[in-house]
Amino acid sequence: MQQLIDNLKKRGILDNSSAGLESLTVPVSAYLGFDPTAPSLHIGHWIGICFLRRLAAYGITPVALVGGATGMIGDPSGKSVERSLLDQAQVLDNSKKIAAALASYLPGIRIVNNADWLGSLSMVDFLRDVGKHFRLGSMLAKDVVKQRVYSEEGISYTEFSYLLLQSYDFAHLFKEHNVVLQCGGSDQWGNITSGIDYIRRRGLGQAYGLTYPLLTDSKGKKIGKTESGTIWLDPALTPPYELFQYFLRLPDQEISKVMRTLTLLDNEEIFALDERLTSDPQAVKKYIAEVIVKDVHGSEGLAQAQAATESFFASKGKSITEAELVALVESGVGVKVARADLIGKRWLDIVVELGFCSSRGQARRLIQQRGLYINQEPLADEQSILDGTQLCFDRYVLLSQGKRKKQVIDLN
């Protein structure tokens, strides 16, 4: 364990750890949780997936927990307002998809679902056997609770109970699967230490915790969000091209944190890339984008992203071919719409309807600034409509927002 701790410190991704953790000897097991609050994992989850892979490389047996029960409650950590509760059917469906994704990214890993033990726990048993081990004073002192209790939004008893449920998870895995270490982002430290204390109070033994820094920008906002929404790992929600472009567009100062947390590149290569950032940041970002897209979507996904990039950003004067447009649509960088649904509509309405612009206000500003392009020509009139003369090969339209954001409309 000491080697892992040293590596994480050197890499700069060790946030907090329990006293005595470095003295643990392998083999040991460690777990990390993924709540199924959506049908897909997002780029923030990739930090945890990389972390589990890193644990395995050091001889630690990784366990992934899908929060089929806790996902119905909602973790208040890092949230200023309460999450909207999902219905049971949605959580069940999300859980299956998250488990399948984890199995594909982490072949052979043990995947557990806390609905298997929390789902059958009665309220009376929970209060009697779990609640009695927790003191309100220490719970209220936790940062995540303290921040919400005194906020205008407050915190519900439902969210307040999340800490107890996560602690019970840790104790269950400790007892049933000999999992002695829980890992997570820095916002999970309070929940993790509560679990360690709960395990001790029950007389089960000594447990440990370890956290890594959250991936945030210079303003403290979590990386992985765009104006269009979340960056998902499911290629049907965020195509490989969009994932690739996301990392190319990141500010230069953010890429150093990205390559430490979202890749398994060794520390020596990371430090060499740090030096290269000062002289050729775009080349470093391109390389890191390639590494991550290949890791998430495989060689085929990377090839799609590269081909789409080549098609969209071809040298000036080079026309995009029909084959390239077809490939872009098939790779997810496009949307198929019935011709009758769009012909004759204003572009101002179309770009909002397709989610290419967040609002008509944004679309108007882009048009006024000559930043919205139809087939590589700036749209000058907000009253302009889509007609048959704008179709490439009598079927396609290439939308562009500035230099980076692109989309193909396939009027099939």
UniProtKB/Swiss-Prot annotation:
Question: What processes in GO biological process is this protein linked to?
Answer: tRNA aminoacylation; tyrosyl-tRNA aminoacylation
Cell compartments where the protein resides: Cytoplasm
Could you tell me the keywords of this UniProt record? Aminoacyl-tRNA synthetase, ATP-binding, Cytoplasm, Ligase, Nucleotide-binding, Protein biosynthesis, RNA-binding
Start and end residues of each S4 RNA-binding domain: 345-411
Q: Does the keyword Transmembrane apply?
A: no
Q: Where does L-tyrosine bind?
A: Y31, Y162, Q166
Reaction(s) catalysed by this chain's protein: tRNA(Tyr) + L-tyrosine + ATP = L-tyrosyl-tRNA(Tyr) + AMP + diphosphate + H(+)
Give the family, as the similarity comment puts it.
Answer: Belongs to the class-I aminoacyl-tRNA synthetase family. TyrS type 1 subfamily.
Q: How does it assemble?
A: Homodimer.
Would you tell me the protein name for this molecule?
Answer: Tyrosine--tRNA ligase
Q: Which organism is it from?
A: Chlamydia trachomatis serovar D (strain ATCC VR-885 / DSM 19411 / UW-3/Cx)
Its lineage reads: Bacteria, Pseudomonadati, Chlamydiota, Chlamydiia, Chlamydiales
